[in-house]
Amino acid sequence: MAQKTTISVIKADIGSLAGHHTVHPDCMAAASRVLAEAKKNGVINDFYVTHVGDDLILIMTHTKGVDHPDVHGLAWEAFKKAAEVAKELGLYAAGQDLLSDAFSGNVRGLGPAAAEMEIEERPSEPIVIFAADKTEPGAFNLPLYKIFADPFNTAGLVIDPRLHDGFVFEVVDVFEDKGVHLNTPEELYDLLALIGTPSRYVIRRVFRKDGKIAAVVSVERLNLIAGKYVGKDDPVMIVRAQSGFPAVGEVLEPFTFPHLVAGWMRGSHNGPLMPVPVRDARPTRFDGPPRVIALGFQVKNAKLVGPSDLFDDPAFDEARRTANKVADYIRRHGPFMPHRLDPSEMEYTTLPQVLERLKDRFKPVKDLPVPKVKHSEMLSGAEEAHD
């Protein structure tokens, strides 16, 4: 049996230059040095370091399988070194996603987000790695549905015999830590009934009907781990493409629609997901709008060839213009829904504190008195004074 290759994409917010919008080059260099030493020592086969917004992203290939403590420990060490540099430079929110001081064999539950898949390499193994900033794991629900279940997006579902049987979606309830497998197209409506609530039901993995993995998403929610708001979850995703999977163009097509996602400023607002090249993955306006990058690689003998910055293409200019128009429109709502998230998503903001402070002032509607407000005497002196 051929040796399997593991692709691990692990990200963390370790501190940003001037607010929450980018990773300092020295932090990326610190992480790269850690990974280069690990590659030299045979812990990993290859790596690439990048960022989206203020999230440092480690892309690694190896042959150790998913959730391997050596690989996760390596990522943890790289993040710690980068965070040390961030603290030396006085960067904002240095080490924000590192919720523990001690590594326990796996980064899951400690703050960083991880998407990993173990595969038998095809003769040509193209993959696309997505990373988003200022949003949550459920932001990939709509694109994944379109990639793997919508024939209006993916022509291969109709005309490619290898895709025609459909795919299996693994959906996770992130509140209850439970999951379910749903077959498409047979259970398409059941799938949509769940994933239309992306704050709770998140697509974690997609499989072909023969069991081969097609896509994987990080599903960690930092507020559920930390018990308070510590930043949005900023997911990463790996998607296999071509030769039995959707074509690269079909994988990218959903991002021509900058759909609304939760996150943006203080993780408490809906906004359009803007597809951008890495050089523009620096959200500034109202700490946004939310951004997503896409890097294309070939994987050969557990080594990375690439990347190609796939959203660095004028074909996505219109999506970016639309995202800016939507951002203009929805920002006009200020603190009102639907721009601001609903109360269930405001649990880790000031809303619970406000409600606690006002709880004794809430009364049954029928018992609410008419308020008496003292007015200043009008300058004209013509109006009557009020109590």
From Swiss-Prot:
What biological-process GO terms show up in the record?
gluconeogenesis
Binding residues for beta-D-fructose 1,6-bisphosphate: 20, 92, 105-106, 134, 242-243, 266, 287, 348
Annotated positions binding Mg(2+) 2: 54-55, 133, 234
**UniProt cross-references to InterPro entries, sorted A to Z:** FBPase_V, FBPase_V_sf
Chain residues that bind dihydroxyacetone phosphate: 20, 134, 266, 287
Q: Which UniProt keywords apply?
A: Carbohydrate metabolism, Gluconeogenesis, Hydrolase, Lyase, Magnesium, Metal-binding, Schiff base
Instruction: Give a yes or no for keyword Lyase in this entry.
Output: yes
Q: Which residues bind Mg(2+) 4?
A: 233
Q: Where does Mg(2+) 3 bind?
A: 232-234
| Activity versus pH, per record | Optimum pH is 8.0 for FBP phosphatase activity and 7-8.5 for the FBP aldolase activity.
On temperature dependence, the record says: Highly thermostable. Survives boiling for 1 hour.
Q: How does it assemble?
A: Homooctamer; dimer of tetramers.
Domain-level remarks: Consists of a single catalytic domain, but remodels its active-site architecture via a large structural change to exhibit dual activities.
**Name of the protein:** Fructose-1,6-bisphosphate aldolase/phosphatase
Protein source organism: Ignicoccus hospitalis (strain KIN4/I / DSM 18386 / JCM 14125)
Organism taxonomic ancestry = Archaea, Thermoproteota, Thermoprotei, Desulfurococcales, Desulfurococcaceae
Q: Its encoding gene is what?
A: fbp
